[in-house]
Amino acid sequence: MEEINKYIQNSSETGGEIYNLIEELFPICRSITGNGVRKTMDIIRKHIPLEIHEVKSGTKVFDWTVPKEWNIKDAYVRNSKGEKVIDFKENNLHVMSYSVPVHKTMTLDELKPYLHTIPGNKDRIPYLTSYYKENWGFSLTQNKFDELCDDDYEVVIDSSLEDGSLTYGEYYIRGELEEEILLTTYTCHPSMCNDNLSGVALITFIAKALSKLKTKYSYRFLFAPETIGSITWLSRNEDKLKNIKMGLVATCVGDAGIKNYKRTKFGDAEIDKIVEKVLMHCGSEYYVADFFPWGSDERQFSSPGINLPVGSLMRSCYGFDGYHTSADNLCYMNKDGLADSYKTYLEVIYTIENNRTYLNLNPKCEPQLGKRGIYRMIGGGSDYPFDEFAMFWVLNMSDGKNSLLDIAYKSGMEFRRIKYAADALYRVELLKLV
Amino acid sequence: MEEINKYIQNSSETGGEIYNLIEELFPICRSITGNGVRKTMDIIRKHIPLEIHEVKSGTKVFDWTVPKEWNIKDAYVRNSKGEKVIDFKENNLHVMSYSVPVHKTMTLDELKPYLHTIPGNKDRIPYLTSYYKENWGFSLTQNKFDELCDDDYEVVIDSSLEDGSLTYGEYYIRGELEEEILLTTYTCHPSMCNDNLSGVALITFIAKALSKLKTKYSYRFLFAPETIGSITWLSRNEDKLKNIKMGLVATCVGDAGIKNYKRTKFGDAEIDKIVEKVLMHCGSEYYVADFFPWGSDERQFSSPGINLPVGSLMRSCYGFDGYHTSADNLCYMNKDGLADSYKTYLEVIYTIENNRTYLNLNPKCEPQLGKRGIYRMIGGGSDYPFDEFAMFWVLNMSDGKNSLLDIAYKSGMEFRRIKYAADALYRVELLKLV
Amino acid sequence: MEEINKYIQNSSETGGEIYNLIEELFPICRSITGNGVRKTMDIIRKHIPLEIHEVKSGTKVFDWTVPKEWNIKDAYVRNSKGEKVIDFKENNLHVMSYSVPVHKTMTLDELKPYLHTIPGNKDRIPYLTSYYKENWGFSLTQNKFDELCDDDYEVVIDSSLEDGSLTYGEYYIRGELEEEILLTTYTCHPSMCNDNLSGVALITFIAKALSKLKTKYSYRFLFAPETIGSITWLSRNEDKLKNIKMGLVATCVGDAGIKNYKRTKFGDAEIDKIVEKVLMHCGSEYYVADFFPWGSDERQFSSPGINLPVGSLMRSCYGFDGYHTSADNLCYMNKDGLADSYKTYLEVIYTIENNRTYLNLNPKCEPQLGKRGIYRMIGGGSDYPFDEFAMFWVLNMSDGKNSLLDIAYKSGMEFRRIKYAADALYRVELLKLV
């Protein structure tokens, strides 16, 4: 898996490509079902051969039921002068997701209970949903709301809520082993970038890179609506769960903030140790949070009956300034941040792929490295052509139980440094793979 | 056990009642045996139906022997002018506890070896005892000592040290379970308040409150002389120890200082976790100390052959300024401190009673809380009518092994918050009691 | 083992004697083999009856082979005026250890690749070796190097590298038990003091002291060349390893720096806890480092196929300013540092010898210490003739599993204080040895 380094080295360039994909997906009005999701999948399929699944409305998925499919053509509020004072075509956040069809004339007072704003941030449109209770509503900025005067308003939501299906995409890469790594992201949010077109685009490019590499583990990429999508996938794939070794949920990975890792519920699972080791040596600031049982789809993967070690590697965590509003737009995206997220995910995968456990074949005292050509020849000086410190750690700890990651932790050294030392020792047959 | 909240809410008022009981008990001259203890028990019995036990002098109790009973009518030192320069009737600390009878005339020089003062605190009378070696003595302030002139002094201790018995009181409340909680305090100190009329009075009122409630656990309240009393009780009740789930020793609970918890010898027993969780959220400063094998009766409960998880929840720990002197008087008592100690003990009992373990009956992914009416209906906003964060913690961790207390610790939330969330989930049949 | 205290009390005087031995050994040119080592052993044998072992060149020792024996009579570089510009007789560091014989005339340019200096410390001669590759070289100060002018130089190394043997010394003291404590030091360094004549001389005097005492454990002292010496010993004594309970490598123990303990690979072995407890109460500053798999012979003892709990108790760790140069000379030695190292090693041995585990024979409640004459007779005061606090800790924790060291840790008390309390309790038959 040294070939992945090529992708890591090109991450800066890839940051731009990820941004371009976000830009292409931005205008589409997505929800947990509907044609917006299908359009999104079509675009992703230009990069990776996503397999599309459609699950019928009414299907029972654990405690939940797949809802009706929602589609929307247009929506507006028009005043008596014929001016659209709220217009879905300007910003699809203006309509509460899953709004039922409406066509009536209402006074301002009648309309007000259906209008939602953020009084404390007067220029942002809030993002609202009502998936499981029939309802309708408009979101708008407080500024626009304040300009509305008494009038008779024509209120139109040209939507449909009918039996249909829930759409999700899946891409599976078979590696040398059946054991698999699960990388998921969610596709249900309309025109917002960090949450979560950034995750969608990042996972697309990670999958694209891995599709060109020979991997030890198998990889599964899941693009599904949040909550109901992961629940649907889990309820249909219980037989596959035994193969999942670890996973990550990708969300909020495109902004300029520092990297932010939310641990699995176990707190010290292999994926936790891997991500934290990568972050420790990443050279920039980061934050690690313990698991909490809300947030994104790690909630479902971590429920006591599923219990998978799934963490979430983000930049600014959900709840950032502008979260779930029109402020989470293309301006909030940062190409360097996207590139760094891409690089970090690849470093994590590099570590997953290379975390082997060896047995020292010369366990009694140190082997004589010099006669094998991997040790300095003049003692006492300070000229160290070989990384003997890392080699000594690997030799000392390779009792068949400690992995290279364990050795990296104990020594305080970067995983790669330990890995390269192990490679050198393996080449001269001082190590055996366990 | 939500009814206990009524007592918690009224703790401020109860603080005053506890103070009144201390005031009533203050003048009595107690020791490890004798009529002062019996008088004390009679007064406590006005509040709770204490069962009184008398254990004969000479009875073997483990390595110890119940000593002779000591009683005292009067004691003084009178100068040649007929003035009582030391008078037991002024303060019963003037006489060393267990002083044998004396009636002789002595010069000052002869008397001096029997006079005890605190040179560094000239206005305090020290509290001294000589239970296990026949001896006699007077305590007085250094100031008074300094005024004594050469003279012939009449020295009188009108005491008796004879076969009799050791008196202790016990009150047992049978709960739903045979498993019991032990709350002990000691009754052997003469006129000193924080050590330990505060403990005696507090436990009286805790027992009074619990006597009116239906409890899950049984409760045993022990009022006995320190050391010899708890040893006596333990030696006579070895068969009961298997039922004791945990316990607390109440002492020094009446002053204005911060709360102070001395852990059990185990350091992380359930009672430790409960008391510390209550303290964490008490809103005021507190201190937690690891176990040390001196102090009060937790020494006996923690001996290697008894090994019970018994901690001690105090305010200013023994050794406070004025400890074991006449300065530990009614002025040292603080009604707010007493009220807060009462409230804290009740909060601990609330937590003991409600610390259940549940099993999530819908373990695969999250259950749909909305369809059960315990979840907000519009997503994305910030209006949270239900405590979904606490509910998510309970659902995520209720695998039949984690108790509500464990969940409270992991989540960082107050125990009550977790408990109420579990109640809500239990009502809609998402949880089963383990 | 209270008799060891006499040696501890005299440590200041012994510091001077250790210094004198260093001074006597300093001029000798040692290497990993050769007559310098033999001469060193002869001098040590004036203090302790060291058994000398000779292992033939060519002997296989695990992955290594005992090298040819190296001896040197003289070496110099002489300019055309007949002046010795580099002279082995002035300082034996001038010749790279294991230099093959040389006799030729060379220009400065031809000679330069064989000259080694420390450019950043112009007045120090570096210490260099080439044990396993035939090579030769001279070390000199940068200052001297800078003075060399173009000339024809006569280059002479009058050495021999021939089949012979590797010499090591061993001294074994049989104690009451077969279980043994291993104390090792290395003898291969030429004229340098802290590294490692300080270790050689210290271990000599520790062995000298123990030879006069009756010990519980057996003690083995090893004086061997670093790396190849300990490997040789280990390969010839595999059957003895099962008896080794713990060990220490003595090196760099003679300077004025603070004490420095490098933990065993286990990190919490008994020797780690003992040394750290001694250091905690030593009254001066110290440092504790986790194990790392380079340094001295603890590397070999800690290899995965040997796995012995061997730490290293030093003062300034290798790598100190002047390390492996001519600056590590007699001026770098400090008699107080030597005395303190000696004292500390003896305190460690005192703790090893006395770390017993007892069973409290009166486990139910506290025993009545007063009736056994080991408790104050008047309660309440502050006169504590007996160390009841330490006795309470011993009684409380002596359940047959906790050692005195465990009790010392839990109580925060010095090991001696706990040991003396246990002695008092043992005398009155309250404890039984486990």
Curated annotation (Swiss-Prot), chains A, B, C:
Domain of life (superkingdom): Bacteria
Cofactor: binding comment: Binds 1 zinc ion per subunit.
Positions in coiled-coil regions: none
Annotated segments matching region Insert: 56-164
Span list, region Permutated winged helix-turn-helix: 356-434
One Pfam match: DUF4910
UniProt keyword annotation of rRNA processing present: no
Sample GO molecular function, one term: metal ion binding
Gene3D superfamilies linked: 3.50.30.90, Winged helix-like DNA-binding domain superfamily/Winged helix DNA-binding domain, Zn peptidases
InterPro entries in the record: DUF2172, DUF4910, UCP015244, UCP01524_HTH, WH-like_DNA-bd_sf
Necessary cofactors: Zn(2+)
Keywords: Carbohydrate metabolism, Metal-binding, Zinc
Region (Aminopeptidase-like): 1-55, 57-355
Similarity comment: Belongs to the UPF0770 family.
Function (record text): The genomic context suggests a role in the biosynthesis of modified polysaccharides; this association with genes involved in carbohydrate metabolism is observed in several phylogenetically distinct taxa. Is not expected to have peptidase activity despite low similarity to aminopeptidases.
UniProt comment concerning the protein's domains: Contains an N-terminal region with low similarity to aminopeptidases, an insert domain, and a C-terminal permutated winged helix-turn-helix domain.
Assembly with partners or alone: Homotrimer.
Name of the molecule in the record: Putative polysaccharide biosynthesis protein with aminopeptidase-like domain
Species per Swiss-Prot/TrEMBL record: Clostridium acetobutylicum (strain ATCC 824 / DSM 792 / JCM 1419 / IAM 19013 / LMG 5710 / NBRC 13948 / NRRL B-527 / VKM B-1787 / 2291 / W)
Upper taxonomic lineage: Bacteria, Bacillati, Bacillota, Clostridia, Eubacteriales
